[in-house]
Amino acid sequence: VKPIIATLIISTLCTPAALPALSLQSYSAASHHRFADDPAFIGNDYDWSGVAYDGDWFTRISDTYYVTAWHARAIGPATFYETNDPLGTTVTVGWDSLTRIGSTDIAIGRFSSSPGSSIAIYGIADETTTQATFASSSYFDMEAFVVGLNGTGGNTTTNFRVGRNEMDGFYDDVALTATNITDMITYDRDSPGLGADEAYLQSGDSGGPLFTTLGSELVLTGIHAGIDPTLSASSFLSNYITEISAIVEAGGESLTLISPVPEPSSSLLIALGAVILSLRRRVS
């Protein structure tokens, strides 16, 4: 079990601040506030409608199920925005139940009704990893979107900021407390290529999602758990797919699982075959 300064993690992300906000290298409302609804928003190519905030974070993973952090668990009604327009159409659903995944910081909640087809359901990255294998995994140095509070105050979904970071660390069995132990993926402040977008978790961000991308699709990879002085950490969902699936399937639903690295398309395979055949002909 690796304690990443457990007291600091919990107190930093759970202690209320006046106007907590995801820390960015250089914040711009146009680029980083989802509900500025600006063409410069770094997330404009993606669908953020399946993430809601009411003082804690909900991320939708099936028709009526969502994932959140156990130590900052989201319960109660959730309001989703169909677009990035703060005056746009919203969908509000009630809350039904919450189930913790073992002794981890991951919890699966259920809404009392479906938010409907206009609200995104996110697939979960299906590649597992460990501290020993992380450097050879698809995730190593992969860029990810980090969702957190915008610092505008209030327990509403419009308090929504997006930054980026590169996932460059992994720890097995991180102990937030003696009874809260989870595999975590981490990211720090040393990604100069990300410029103004580089993000670091702060108070209030616990339970928010960490997304990788595949084409124009957001792929759910982690749920924010905490920080220490040098890094941010998110609970790594892929290592708990069996447990998450069991809860969702017991309710008659299913997860969408996504490989973080796309398989070669049939057209690409055909093209490669043609190149190989051409080379063989030249040799002969």
Please annotate each region the language model reported.
Residues 106, 112-198, 238:
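Chymotrypsin/trypsin-fold serine protease catalytic domain
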Residues 99-100, 155, 198-203:
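Short Gly/Pro-enriched turn/cap motifs at secondary-structure boundaries
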Residues 62-63, 67-104, 114-116, 138-142, ...:
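Catalytic-histidine neighborhood of serine endopeptidases
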Residues 79-84, 147-149, 211-213:
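A generic structural motif
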Residues 5-24, 249-270:
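Short, threonine-centered small-residue motifs that mark membrane-proximal processing/anchoring sites
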Residues 21-50, 54-73, 162, 170-173, ...:
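C-terminal subregion of chymotrypsin/trypsin-like serine protease catalytic domains
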Residues 277-284:
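C-terminal membrane-anchoring or membrane-association module
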Residues 56, 89-96, 159-164, 219:
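Short beta-strand segments
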